[in-house]
């Protein structure tokens, strides 16, 4: 069990649904209102103090989406592990491609879970008394110094794999993870990505590592094979931990989350959405790479799937706001905001759709955008996506005004 000290850190349709669920009491406390940020053209709106709304069902929907999404991510990582095992059993171009395709597919679920970060939940908690941290850094750290793991162009003996004094074990791999340099990443999605694809030296396609790097009993191939197996298993272990902490009807983080102060909890949820939008996606993953023009600043540079990262991060935000995930249709925050400010809800939906559209228009692979000259259509499309994400985050902050909570844009 994870306890709190480890985590310090249309109106009519909506109304009818809430009444059917027994979650809304229309006890008007008083007619007070707030004027929203005029730059966003949000009109006078009802505050949460005017309605006795039971917020818990919205939080329960959110929690179930988190659980289902992490469950899918773990299941798809299991499928990837099987594909990698088949590849290592019979290393050839076909099994190699199948393993790479499984990695790409598995990423799609995980990327949506990034909408659950930035409030020190199971994914990124920090225990100040022990220094223990959530597994986010082990799972998805980037950018990475690939030479810390394996050979790179011009350095055939680089990395832990080619160091005869380093014993390939999960303990050793974890002990060396991001110790002296945050770029010295030894685990997670991008370590697996590098091992499967190798370095990417052109803007026409992904890395071209050969399957022959994994033929047994040749050079350091056995060490490379073992390393790939171990970091894949570690990824699944970390995903299983996240899945278990959000499992329903258990003595875990989810139980505490649902029973915490509901307004404060919703503030955390929208801080997560705003931060993913404006800081992580807009700034760290698009703007930084555009400014440098360096392929190494791509989020998924080895596989050339950075565009997929943007698409499924945006989908994760969509899932949370509308309370939908695949076949699960819960009570969405769109329904809550519709009760309080239909115009704000409309603006959020417009912003979400604009972000999805602008991201879909980014040229792919993304390294072609980075290689494009300043002022080119390719760069302008990416810059428009940045603006859309920033606008989206600012509108999310207006939810804080309606609910009387803090919605922040955090910078790690």
Residue locations for each model-derived region?
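Signal peptide processing junction and immediate N-terminal pro/mature segment
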Residues: 29-43
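Domain-scale selection of a single, long terminal region
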Residues: 2-3, 31-32, 74, 82
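Mature extracytoplasmic or organellar-lumen-exposed domains after removal of signal/transit peptides
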Residues: 40-412
């Amino acid at each position: 069990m994870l306890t709190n000290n480890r985590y310090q850190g249309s109106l009519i349709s909506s109304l009818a649904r809430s009444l059917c669920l027994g979650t809304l009491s229309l006890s008007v406390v008083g007619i007070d209102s707030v004027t929203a940020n005029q730059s966003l053209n949000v009109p006078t709106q009802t505050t949460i103090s005017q309605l006795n709304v039971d917020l818990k069902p919205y939080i329960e929907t959110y929690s179930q989406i988190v659980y289902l999404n992490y469950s899918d991510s773990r299941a798809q990582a299991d499928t990837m592990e099987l594909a990698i095992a088949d590849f290592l059993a019979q290393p050839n171009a076909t099994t190699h491609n199948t393993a790479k395709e499984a990695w790409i597919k598995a990423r799609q679920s995980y990327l949506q879970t990034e909408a659950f970060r930035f409030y020190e939940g199971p994914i990124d908690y920090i225990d100040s008394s022990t220094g223990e941290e959530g597994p986010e850094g082990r799972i998805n750290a980037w950018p990475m110094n690939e030479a810390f793991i394996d050979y790179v162009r011009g350095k055939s003996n680089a990395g832990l794999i080619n160091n005869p004094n380093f014993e390939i074990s999960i303990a050793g791999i974890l002990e060396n993870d991001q110790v002296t340099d945050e770029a010295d990443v030894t685990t997670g999605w991008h370590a697996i990505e590098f091992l499967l694809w190798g370095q990417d030296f052109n803007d026409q396609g992904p890395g071209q590592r050969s399957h022959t790097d994994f033929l047994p009993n040749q050079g350091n191939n056995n060490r490379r094979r073992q390393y790939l197996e171990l970091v894949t298993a570690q990824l699944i272990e970390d995903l299983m931990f996240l899945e278990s902490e959000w499992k329903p009807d258990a003595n875990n983080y989810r139980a505490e989350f649902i029973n915490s102060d509901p307004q404060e909890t919703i503030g955390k949820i929208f801080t997560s959405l705003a931060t993913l939008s404006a800081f992580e996606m807009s700034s760290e993953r698009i703007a930084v790479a555009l400014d440098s023009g360096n392929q190494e600043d791509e989020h998924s540079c080895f596989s050339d799937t950075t565009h997929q990262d943007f698409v499924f991060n945006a989908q994760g935000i969509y899932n949370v706001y509308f309370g939908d995930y695949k076949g699960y249709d819960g009570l969405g925050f769109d329904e809550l905001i519709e009760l309080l400010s239909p115009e704000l809800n409309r603006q959020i939906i417009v912003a979400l759709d604009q972000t999805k559209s602008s991201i879909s228009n980014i040229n792919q692979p993304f390294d072609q955008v980075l290689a494009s000259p300043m002022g080119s259509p390719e760069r302008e499309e990416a810059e428009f996506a940045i603006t859309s994400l920033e606008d989206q985050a600012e509108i999310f902050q207006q939810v804080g005004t309606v609910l009387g909570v803090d919605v922040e844009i955090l910078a790690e």
